[in-house]
Amino acid sequence: WHFLESQEKTVNVIVPNAFPDFLRWMPGAKDIIRYDKYTEFANKLLNEADVICCLDFNALSRIDAMADAVAQSPARKMMIDHHLNPEAFCRIIISHPEISSTSELVFRLICRLGYFEDITKEGAECIYTGMMTDTGGFTYNSNDREIYFIISELLSKGIDKDEIYRKVYNTYSEGRLRLMGYVLYDKMQVFPQFNSALVWLTKEEQSKFQYVKGDTEGFVNIPLSIKNIIFSVFLREDTEKNMIKVSLRSVGAFPCNKVAAEFFNGGGHLNASGGEFYGTMDEAIDLFKQALVKYEELLLAKK
């Protein structure tokens, strides 16, 4: 958005629904249009657009109610994404699953076009934030040395990466911290015989702690700090739709994306994936246990 604005283009950013509060500080965030809140206006913009850039998703199903409007728009469509198996709904597809984040891919694309000098400090802050959050603070999918060269280039734009970290990870509500304590004490089950762990939350439990979107960000990673745990799954009843959101994380060579695809209608990267489950929490937990049994050999494999 910042780059295209610098090229004197008329640009609008539309997202399917609310984004987490910890990202609201970002330059330009106040101008983002929520499709679920301003549907008629968003439909008009999509229908009148010359180009639609589809960022960080590779299937129309990922953008919920916004999918039909994007599909039916006469605009030329371009996908920029880093997830596996892109669908062919765009004329131009720039898909690189080996890249750590779509933000990194956007940076590379701008530089390849010869416009590095046009990246502003505000644009650099957004790119860095996307790279940081999509790699868990550079703790997974981030061993490529070029990532850190890119960070050095972003630093040359005047960004304060320490301040960005604080704004993203150190501005949570009291309710989130109490919810985290509750989860760790009551809602985390460790399966040492499978080197795995499970965390789960119901709608009622989220309501009890005044849940807002983003409050459970990173919860799935917590069990991975336990010695020998290499696979963690977080099941959360969605507060807006009648389904269970599934987050999967792993370390090393364990393919949580295969588990996501086989058991939870999802997919993603080797160490970070997501999915959805339509059923009860008990059924979802049973499915998780079935996955442990099926993948026992890989879960117990020596490095």
Report residues per predicted region:
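Short acidic, glycine/serine/threonine-rich loops at helix termini
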Residues: 24-27, 66, 89-92, 107, ...
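Short hydrophobic "helix-edge" motifs at membrane interfaces and signal-peptide entry regions
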Residues: 71, 123-125, 255-256
